[in-house]
Amino acid sequence: MRLLILFLFLPLFPLAQKKKAPDFALGNFTDDYKITYTINDTLWIQHPNTKYHIIKWNKKKQYLVAKNAESNKEDANKYTRIDYMTFKNMEPYLWGFCLTVYDAATEKIAKKTAYVDRKNPKKGCNGYPFSRMRRVEEKVVK
């Protein structure tokens, strides 16, 4: 009986793991452009009003796929792929991201759209730099 219960719940574990963000990406941040963000395992908020509902984190390939919130003024209910990378010797910026695609019609299209160059973070985001993120004090998410 216990074995049967284990097998019934076993398929749920990989799903839970795919929604887990890397530790460095959790919290409150400001980027190079003074835009603020709050990020957790399931939600990426670009303050004040842009929200991405995270479907999957791919830690190995360093990207996430999200569905744009219905309330977003631009590209509502479309899909976004955000590629990220960590930095060395760029303190206080420890990591950065690229909105690789933000208006894909489907999750599958967003997932397959991959053209970042992490070897060149100054131009590796479709000719633009990765947005560098630095941690800031906590802000209450509403």
Describe the function of each predicted region.
Residues D23, D31-Y33, A76, G127:
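Residues that act as N-cap/strand-start positions at coil-to-secondary-structure junctions
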Residues L15-G27, V140-K142:
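Sec-dependent signal peptide cleavage junction
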Residues E70-K142:
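Beta-strand-rich cores of mature extracytoplasmic or soluble domains
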Residues M1-A21:
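Bacterial Sec-dependent N-terminal signal peptides
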Residues L26-K59:
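Short, solvent-exposed loop/hinge segments that bridge or flank secondary-structure elements
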